[in-house]
Design a protein with these regions (language model features):
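Aromatic-capped interface at the extracytoplasmic side
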Residues: 73-75, 203-204
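Generic preference for hydrophobic
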Residues: 75, 88, 110-111, 217-219
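Short amphipathic alpha-helix with an adjacent loop that forms part of the alpha/beta core around
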Residues: 77-81, 149-152
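Short acidic-hydrophobic, aromatic-tinged amphipathic segments that line or gate anion-handling sites
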Residues: 75, 132-135, 225
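Catalytic core of membrane glycerolipid acyltransferases/transacylases, capturing the structured
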Residues: 35-60, 66-68, 80-139
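Non-catalytic C-terminal accessory region of glycerolipid acyltransferases
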Residues: 1-11, 15-18, 143-262
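N-terminal membrane-anchoring alpha-helices
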Residues: 1-74
Length: 262
């Protein structure tokens, strides 16, 4: 399905896509280094200072994507986000949503792999921003520790973003939802906001190419607390997958001109 979608849309010269992508990637990683240096004083400030600086970095990335790669973004359903603490279960197709969703929620934090917290500087800032680490190698203990930390952040009024499939999935790939989100939902007692998107069409998994087009993100109806785990997980998967399939089918990236074409 993913490759079929690549066949649709306005054609853009292959060499132009490659050139834009290389330029963007160079600037993207350069800005990471710049912001890591700029962020050093935030170690002496409250946690929200690094979160706000991360939002500035996210806006910079969106500007670079729009200016260089001709990738725009549209958010729908923002009025559906309830006030106060909640969990956010987002479709994960690309690295894009790991920074872009920072701009959707007022006090966001992410559930992340514990190994990321060990990366020099980058990981330290994740600790400072009070991200919620999870150890994939120790499942039961990991769920307990994750829940404890999640509750701490929810008491601070934060929105906890989790990717329920645990890893990036190519557009059109069969869903693979994990039980961790159901555990978090049952143990925290806060609403869960599903998020659908089509970012993988433009910023592909394990691809350096950035295809022009419009990434669409849709905030879906919140799932209230109180459902049993199985019912919740079935509803979550249905809501996210249905909306994501619609967004993917409605918008495909421009295709590069085949090599050798005139």
């Amino acid at each position: 399905m993913y490759h079929e979608l690549r066949k649709r849309g306005t054609r853009v010269p292959h060499v132009l896509i490659i050139a834009r992508s290389i330029l963007f990637n160079v600037l993207f990683y350069f800005t990471i280094l710049i912001y890591l240096v700029v962020a050093l004083p935030t170690f002496l400030m409250p946690y929200w200072a690094i979160v706000e600086l991360a939002k500035v970095w996210a806006r910079t990335n969106l500007w670079l994507l729009r200016t260089i790669c001709r990738i725009d973004v549209e958010f729908a359903g923002l009025n559906k986000i309830p006030p106060g603490p909640l969990t956010v279960a987002a479709k994960h197709q690309s690295f894009w949503e790991t920074f872009a969703l920072l701009l959707v929620f007022s006090r966001p934090t992410y559930i992340v792999k514990r190994e990321l917290m060990w990366i020099p500087l980058f990981g330290w800032f994740m600790w400072k921003g009070r991200m919620v680490p999870v150890d994939r190698g120790a499942r039961r203990q990991a769920l307990t520790a994750m829940t404890r930390r999640a509750r701490e952040e929810l008491r601070r009024g934060r929105q906890i973003i989790i990717f329920p499939e645990g890893t990036r999935r190519q557009p059109g790939a069969p869903p693979a939802y994990k039980s961790g989100i159901a555990h978090l939902y049952a143990e925290t007692g806060v609403p869960c906001v599903p998020v659908a998107l089509n970012s993988g069409l433009y910023w592909g998994r394990r691809s350096f190419k950035r295809y022009p087009g419009t990434i669409r993100v849709e905030i879906l109806d919140p799932i209230p607390p109180g459902l049993d785990k199985n019912t919740f997980l079935q509803r979550l998967e249905h809501d996210i997958e249905t909306a994501t399939a619609r967004l993917v089918a409605a918008a495909a990236p421009p295709q590069a001109e085949p090599q050798g074409s005139g």
